[in-house]
Swiss-Prot record:
Belongs to the ATPase alpha/beta chains family. It comes from Gluconobacter oxydans (strain 621H). GO terms for cellular component: plasma membrane; proton-transporting ATP synthase complex. This is ATP synthase subunit alpha 2. Produces ATP from ADP in the presence of a proton gradient across the membrane. The alpha chain is a regulatory subunit.
Length: 507
């Protein structure tokens, strides 16, 4: 039986070898820091390093490879703790930057590496995802057919957004971009959508206001807030949107629905320009490196509606970008407009005139969301967008003088009513029933001559009134169904009973 004993001994040895195998990052490749400064380290001695590879400087200090040269590599640091000097050893890990993901992040405020910022203790991670993950293949995607209610009447009626869409919010500084994005999060308070908000280089006071708004008006237990503070290492700002995308993908890949707000990609582009120039990459237009389009495209392509075979989950992205003096033809805005499925453009002039949200109807568009709009809302809107666009053009023309005829005056009065209806206060998102009711009332002339302030007063109790006095119709609307002709007549009659006495009292 010697052969049997020999075979048993060999199998035991093989099992022992397999047990001793480690699949963790390797730390036996060592390089040397040649130069260090501004959050960037120049390293030699790691000829086999790969882009985005995680490097360890010891004592909990890490960075990742961002640039590869013939005899050196550029490394972006991920933390400011400790000191790194020229001549220090650096080890390649053969791993990549990863973040904790899972339900344990819900209700938490974390940095881009998943470290807690809310004082609630360590995050309970179900697993870890690399910050850079491939976008879903075309065969694994499905058409955008389900609506995302943003709670902003001007968007849900004129430029609807669907689950799995990428819709850019762009405008000058302080025109309400973050307000619209946060309102979209608040509007998910009572549904099944997970919300992730990532702040990139924003002022601490601004981020604190967002956190407090979500805590008091939304459902913080279904939200993840990722904060990359401007005082942190540039590497944290750079990976922030990618890390937040990975956190949202966890839920999408399990058949759930997620909404990601990236605030904002203009600051991320500035960070990418900074670290790229410091690592020696040649500058291009507006000093941005040539790969800036690719960086943002590979990020936003990860947002998608998955097919039923992949679980049917969705990840909707609302990236924010800033313009200067309304210049949409600048490099970063044009890049993002071409990458995304539409854009909500906010106009400084409209904002200063008190039209809030200051959505510019002429240049805003949603390329795929129209198919996802709720059928009842689509039928209620009718020619609203066309009427409003014609009103804006006609109003500008009449400013040159002349006496408008009766027909023109009627068009101007009708357009003024639409404009007043579309005005909305901050952090007061509307539900589907309220939106359908307001649009129906406007389209049937029930709000003609009523000021925006009085419309908001009428709107405040409208939903509760309809649920009490037209419960059957209200239930049909909230379920997304289409009303019959008889139901439409009853609905308009109920609206008239509610609106007319209140409009008269307001007058």
């Amino acid at each position: 039986m010697p052969d049997t004993d020999q075979a048993a001994s060999w199998l035991a040895s093989a099992r022992s070898s397999l047990t001793d195998i480690s699949v963790g990052p390797r730390t036996d490749r060592t390089g040397r820091v040649e130069d260090i400064g501004d959050g960037i380290a120049l390293i030699s001695g790691l000829p086999d390093a790969k882009l985005d590879e995680l490097l360890s400087f010891g004592n909990g200090r890490y960075g990742f490879v961002h640039g590869l040269e013939e005899d050196s590599i550029g490394c972006i640091l991920l933390n400011n703790e400790g000191t790194i000097e020229a001549g220090d050893a650096v080890q390649g890990t053969s791993g990549v930057v990863s973040v904790p993901v899972g339900p344990g992040l819900l209700g938490r405020v974390v940095d881009p590496l998943g470290r807690p910022l809310d004082g609630k203790g360590p995050v309970e991670a179900e697993t870890w995802f690399p910050v850079e993950r491939p976008a879903p293949a075309i065969i694994d995607r499905e058409l955008v057919t389900e609506p995302v209610q943003t709670g902003t009447l001007a968007i849900d009626t004129l430029f609807p957004i669907g689950r799995g869409q990428r819709e850019l919010i762009v405008g000058d500084r302080a025109t309400g971009k973050t307000t619209i994005a946060v309102d979209a999060i608040l509007a998910q308070k009572s549904n099944d959508m997970i919300c992730v908000y990532v702040a990139i280089g924003q002022k601490t006071s601004s981020v604190q206001r967002v956190i407090e708004t979500i805590r008091t008006r939304g459902n913080p237990d279904r939200c993840i807030i990722v904060v990359a503070r401007p005082a942190e290492a540039p590497g944290l700002c750079w990976i922030a949107p990618f890390a937040a995308m990975s956190m949202a993908e966890y839920f999408r890949d399990r058949g759930q629905h997620a909404l990601l707000v990236i605030d904002d990609l203009s600051k991320h582009a500035a960070t990418h320009r900074e670290v790229s120039l410091l690592t020696g990459r040649p500058p291009g237009r507006e000093a941005y490196p040539g790969d800036i389009f690719y960086v943002h495209a590979r990020l936003l392509e990860r947002a998608a509606k998955l097919s039923a075979a992949k679980g049917g989950g969705s990840l909707t992205a609302l990236p924010v970008a800033e313009t200067e003096a309304g210049n949409l033809s600048a490099y970063i805005p044009t890049n993002l407009i071409s990458i995304t499925d539409g854009q909500i453009v906010l106009n400084r002039t409209l904002f200063d005139q008190g039209q809030k949200p200051a959505v510019d109807v002429g240049v805003s568009v949603s390329r795929v969301g129209g198919a996802a709009q709720s059928p009842i809302l689509r039928s209620s809107v009718g020619t609203l967008r066309l009427d409003y666009a014609q009103f804006i053009e006609l109003e500008a023309f009449t400013r040159f003088g002349g006496l408008p005829d009766t027909h023109v005056r009627q068009q101007l009065a009708r357009g003024a009513c639409i404009r007043a209806t579309l005005r909305q206060g901050p952090h007061a998102p509307l539900d589907l029933l309220q939106e359908v009711a307001l649009v129906t009332a406007s389209q049937n002339g029930l709000l003609d001559g009523v000021t925006a302030k009085n419309i908001r007063t009428i709107q405040s109790g409208l939903g509760d009134y309809l649920r009490s006095n037209a419960s059957e119709i209200s239930t049909a609307i909230e379920s997304g169904g289409v009303l019959s002709a008889e139901q439409k007549e009853r609905f308009v009659a109920c609206l008239r009973q509610y609106v007319e006495p209140r409009a008269s009292a307001a007058s």
